[in-house]
Amino acid sequence: MNDKQIEAVEQVYYEVDYTFTCTFDRFNERIRVDHYDGNLHSILEHIQTIFTNEFTKCIVKVQREHVSYFLSMGYIVEGMIEAYYLGSDAYLMTLYNADWRRNSPSWIEEDQLLAAVRRKQASPLTEKPLMRKGTEADAEALALLYKNVFAVYPTPMYNPNYIKKVMKNDTIFFLMEENNRIVSAASAEINRTNKNAEMTDCATRSENRKGGTMRHLIMALEQELLKEKIYYAYSIARSRSFGMNAVLYQLNYHYGGRLVNNVRIYSDWENMNLWSKRLIKSAE
């Protein structure tokens, strides 16, 4: 396992009768295809050549009409993001290069946690707190927050320069402060092509996890996304995190499945739950 945090690298392949975009994520030992078009047979053959033993997981966001073909080629469905492709669903389909990556000893425990999330009555929100949009000037303080909350994180959020880079690349941050330090933050990574955004980088210092802090931040991000004409949101939450899954469930995100040993986060490899929401309905 590679212990050095390395930024993922995106590469676009343009061939005669197809194109696809692949992210090489060496820290998490995976490749991920977020967009493809053209000859499916050629695309899958090409993916097979780049899915080397350096990686243990391959993920493709598959359009609904292509699911059966991917199944016939040995891929499995791990989850679904509602309305990912301009209102059409995306199916996350996977291949593996290692048995350990495919198997999860905590699956039943995480099923039980999800059932408890559904049973839990939402606690009342506190009065809307002071929140603001993050700027590049906050990068150092945000990096300190992520270092405080996560021993391991799947992207280089401990690096202020990386935070500045994602801000420049259409990621919006909202944050809360107390005693001149950031105590909670969340971001929305915008995909303007497909009119969606990933709600991510959610972190709250342990002493500030009361009163619906993260719910307030995500609701603020949702309103900001609507201003940006982004109509669909999704999030990928740690399957072991009762609090984060409860936040998404209580904000009317729909559960869409679980990604096995998807990333290194918090302290180890973890399964991740998929959640998605059509923001248009929440604004009606």
Give names to the regions the model predicted.
Residues 1-53, 68, 100:
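N-terminal charged segments
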Residues 128-142:
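A short beta-loop-alpha structural element at the N-terminal edge
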Residues 38-49, 204, 210-227, 246, ...:
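Conserved acetyl-CoA-binding loop-helix of GNAT-fold acetyltransferases
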Residues 59-67, 235-245, 249, 262-266:
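Conserved beta-strand-loop-alpha-helix junction that forms the acyl-donor binding cleft
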Residues 12-30, 143-206:
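A conserved beta-strand-loop-helix scaffold within acyl/acetyltransferase catalytic domains
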Residues 61, 76-91, 254-271:
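Conserved catalytic-core motifs of GNAT/GCN5-like acyltransferases
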Residues 69-70, 75, 247-252:
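Conserved active-site tyrosine of GNAT-family acetyltransferases
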Residues 51-62, 225-237:
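Conserved GNAT acetyl-CoA-binding A-motif
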